[in-house]
A protein has these predicted regions:
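Conserved functional hotspots at enzyme active or ligand-binding sites that engage polyanionic ligands
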Residues: 1-109
Length: 109
């Protein structure tokens, strides 16, 4: 498992009406490789509103259609739920993800 990888998660939450949802791993690699049982992820929705806290992803990343990563809705998921690999972000998309996460968390460079 690596930062920037996308996974389809079955029944991610009782509040989520979808049977499955794609998430991108945003935790730092040291945490991913540690004994911690969870990682921080951002959900992928088909909606993309152009907010500074969202980045566009699409079929090149393994998705069925154009979508958006929503960095305002970070969640902690057990690593054991992240088994259905979909694809991964390009280096350019990872840079955009970093910017969107900084905006969502109001971090300054």
């Amino acid at each position: 498992m690596r930062r920037g990888e996308l996974y389809r998660v079955r029944r991610p939450s009782s509040r989520d009406p979808k049977r499955s949802r794609v998430f991108v791993v945003v935790s730092r690699q040291v945490l991913i490789e540690s004994r911690f049982s969870t990682v921080i992820c951002a959900p992928v929705y088909t909606a993309y509103d152009g907010l500074s806290t969202q980045i566009q992803v699409g079929v090149s990343g393994g998705l069925k259609h154009a979508s958006g990563i929503h960095c305002d809705e970070l969640v902690s998921l057990p690593k054991t739920m992240l088994t259905d690999y979909v694809g991964s972000l390009s280096a350019g998309q990872l840079q955009k993800l970093d910017v969107a996460l900084r905006m969502a968390l109001q971090l300054h460079e």
